[in-house]
From Swiss-Prot:
InterPro entries (UniProt xref): Rubredoxin-like_dom, Rubredoxin_dom, Rubredoxin_ET, Rubredoxin_Fe_BS
Designated name of the protein: Probable rubredoxin HupI
Name of the coding gene: hupI
Note describing how the cofactor binds: Binds 1 Fe(3+) ion per subunit.
Record CDD domains: rubredoxin (cd00730)
Organism, as annotated: Bradyrhizobium diazoefficiens (strain JCM 10833 / BCRC 13528 / IAM 13628 / NBRC 14792 / USDA 110)
Length: 69
């Protein structure tokens, strides 16, 4: 078994999971949404449009990691 097995595979990401940008550490919290991109509160990360990016550093969605509450 490699230390990198399943690296980058998102598991256990629910509609309320908070995710953090791996570049600038900005947190996307579904409860808050994203005022900059006009994303309504209550919008889960999976429902964000593909073109959505970090409001702080412009990193793509793929750079976000699930964090524990």
């Amino acid at each position: 078994m490699s230390a990198f097995e399943n690296f980058g595979v998102r598991q256990d990401v629910t509609d309320v999971t908070r995710l953090e940008c791996g570049i600038c550490w900005t947190v996307y919290d579904p409860a808050d949404g994203d005022d900059v991109a006009q994303i309504a509160p209550g919008t889960p990360f999976a429902a964000l449009p593909e073109e959505w990016h970090c409001p702080n550093c412009d990193a793509p969605k793929s750079k976000f990691m699930a964090i524990e509450s």
